[in-house]
């Protein structure tokens, strides 16, 4: 037999390592140990199993050719030994043995290794609040809990649900409850927005409004402080500083932490973000590798360390570990946290840095915001997809892209293309000139990503001067905050009428194609905030006004297409 490879963890990175290593090292003796009875399942599919999109939990455990990934499958098809219900309790690095115990009997044993792989994943963070351990409070940490939750839904035991945490998993679970099952669902998020630190507030607001329109109550800026039990000891209420919400079930989706205790107790180098590894995913012990949610990852844009708990990355990392076990020397460049999330009839996605994150990382960052069509404007299924391109003004490097749109592949296509370019240090020019596939049913002749880059170019070269969304919203909430501002609305009169009626002198109407004739009628003592539907007409008007000496203008990036999705309180009633 060849080298003894022992892998701790059998969900994503571990099985991927084992299967790739088997293909590269036919003579290796490969063993996976996992403390659970279920292995190698699609954990990211759990919310869709709960929702009913995936009918049977066994589908999450099957291959694309419909074989269930269990111990027998791995042994017979892959030649890999899997020991389930076996907990790794220690690593004897000197003697190169993994210390394990049987979960049921407590019997202890050792497994010798030449190379060890730690892929222990992550563990849910449970808020340290009263009632967090009550019956009826669940984390989404494994398939067993998902089966239990779906069983309660299917038997009519859940009429109301509270999800604590407005991250991706929490929102996916909220949709799962509210959509198919019709459960009265509330989301409680401590931070002032959904998907905090991942997307910028204006994109979060669009997401929040859509979820509320689909029947989910969203309470941001208020964390859960207590979970109250009924007379049977079951969770029945969630308390925040502002309200008490009745519930039949509580989902604790407040993030995850790396499961790195085994490595730490063995004396390996760890950080708050996970097990420290080099670019070949070796730990501080060259005979021990690590992959998946349990490792610390370098951000490919900022260079900062972070935790990236994504099944896609875990599989990629597992392959790289196997390559290095076989001596191929494959390196891991890091990650950017690219994600896409379904939210009822919409989706939201991002890659790289948000504007807030980019500025916090020290970049001279700005953002081009657009609302382009996802396909030819004359095509029947055309829809707008608000996009944001974050860039560094000093270097023209693109730092991140965010998108929001209908539940199709339009946003995903732009996020994926952006991720590939950003990973290679792509600039505004690279994005502007990137050749994207085109046919009217799929895209516009000048793709949405190209258009966003062109806006970024105009901004970076100071051809286009913008008012930011936060600045515009603050002014709309209180005109006295910027008394020398006025809106110049160049949309069709039918679109403008309600605004001029409501806002009076603060709202100037001048149709786009009449500006060249009538610009002398514009007020000269005001800074004009030029508004159209998506920003294109506004920029052209700004360029023209500059040419005739009127330079006190600012463009609202993304136009009112963004505003309608954000549903501000000042919006005129229909």
Where do the language-model regions lie?
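Mid-to-C-terminal Rossmann-like scaffold of FAD/NAD(P)H-dependent oxidoreductases
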Residues: 2-4, 294-409, 440-444, 448-477
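Beta1-alpha1 glycine-rich phosphate/pyrophosphate-binding loop at the start
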Residues: 2-83, 176-199, 338, 417-420, ...
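FAD-site-proximal beta/loop scaffold in flavoenzymes
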Residues: 133-157, 229-237, 241-320, 417, ...
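Glycine-rich dinucleotide-binding loop and its adjacent helix/turn
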Residues: 115-181, 217, 272, 277-279, ...
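Rossmann-like dinucleotide-binding cores of NAD(P)H-dependent redox enzymes
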Residues: 160-161, 168-228, 308-314, 331, ...
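Rhodanese-like catalytic fold shared by cysteine-dependent sulfurtransferases
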Residues: 430-440, 444, 451-485, 493-529, ...
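N-terminal Rossmann-fold NAD(P) dinucleotide-binding loop
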Residues: 14-15, 170-171, 538
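A Rossmann-like FAD-binding core segment of flavoenzymes
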Residues: 27-31, 77-79, 83-104, 111, ...
């Amino acid at each position: 037999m060849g080298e003894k490879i022992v892998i701790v963890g059998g969900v994503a990175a571990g099985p991927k390592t084992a299967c790739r290593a088997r293909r590269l090292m036919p003579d290796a003796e490969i063993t996976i140990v996992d403390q659970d009875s279920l292995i190698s399942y699609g954990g990211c599919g759990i919310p869709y199993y709960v929702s009913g999109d995936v009918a049977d939990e066994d589908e999450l455990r099957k291959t694309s050719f419909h074989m269930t990934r269990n111990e027998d499958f791995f042994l017979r098809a892959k030649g890999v030994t899997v020991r389930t219900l076996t907990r790794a309790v220690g690593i004897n690095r000197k003697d190169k043995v993994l210390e394990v115990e049987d979960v049921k009997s407590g019997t202890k044993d050792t497994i010798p290794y030449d190379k060890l792989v730690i892929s222990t994943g992550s563990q849910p963070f449970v808020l340290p609040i009263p009632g967090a351990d009550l019956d009826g409070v669940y984390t989404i940490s494994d398939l067993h809990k998902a089966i239990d939750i779906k069983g309660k839904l299917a038997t009519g035991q859940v009429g109301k649900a509270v999800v604590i945490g407005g991250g991706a998993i929490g929102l996916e679970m909220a949709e799962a409850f509210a959509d198919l099952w019709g459960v009265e669902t509330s989301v409680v998020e401590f931070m002032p927005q959904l998907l905090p630190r991942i997307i910028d507030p204006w994109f979060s607001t669009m997401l929040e409004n859509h979820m509320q329109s689909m029947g989910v109550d969203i309470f941001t800026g208020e964390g859960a402080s207590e979970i109250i039990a009924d007379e049977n000891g079951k969770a029945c209420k969630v308390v925040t500083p502002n309200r008490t919400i009745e519930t039949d079930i509580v989902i604790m989706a407040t993030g995850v932490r790396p499961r790195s205790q085994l490595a730490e107790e063995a004396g390996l180098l760890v950080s708050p973000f996970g097990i420290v590894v080099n670019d070949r995913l070796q730990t501080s012990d060259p005979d021990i590798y690590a992959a998946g949610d349990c490792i610390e990852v370098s951000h490919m844009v900022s260079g900062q360390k972070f935790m990236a708990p994504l099944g896609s990355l875990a599989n990629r990392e597992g392959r790289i570990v196997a390559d290095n076990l076989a001596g191929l020397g494959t390196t891991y460049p890091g990650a950017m946290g690219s994600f896409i999330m379904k939210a009822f009839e919409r989706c939201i996605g991002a890659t790289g840095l948000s504007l807030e994150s980019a500025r916090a990382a020290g970049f001279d960052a700005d953002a081009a915001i657009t609302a382009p069509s996802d396909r030819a404007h004359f095509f029947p299924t055309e829809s707008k997809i608000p996009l944001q391109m974050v860039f560094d003004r000093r270097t023209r490097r693109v730092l991140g892209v965010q998108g929001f749109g209908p539940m199709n592949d339009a946003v995903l296509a732009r996020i994926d293309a952006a991720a590939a370019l950003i990973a290679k240090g792509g600039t505004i020019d690279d994005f502007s000139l990137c050749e994207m596939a085109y046919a009217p049913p799929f895209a516009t002749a000048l793709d949405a990503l190209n258009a966003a880059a062109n806006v970024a170019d105009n901004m970076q070269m100071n051809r286009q001067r913008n008012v930011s969304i936060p600045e515009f919203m603050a002014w709309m909430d209180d005109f006295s905050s910027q008394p020398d501002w006025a809106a110049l609305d160049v949309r069709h009169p039918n679109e403008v009428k309600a605004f001029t009626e409501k806002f009076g002198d603060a709202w100037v109407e001048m149709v786009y194609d009449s500006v060249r004739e009538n610009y002398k009628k514009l007020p000269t003592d005001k800074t004009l905030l030029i508004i159209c539907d998506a920003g294109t007409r506004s920029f052209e008007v700004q360029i023209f006004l500059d040419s005739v000496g009127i330079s006190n203008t600012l463009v609202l990036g993304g136009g009112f297409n963004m505003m309608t999705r954000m549903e501000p309180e000042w919006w005129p009633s229909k």
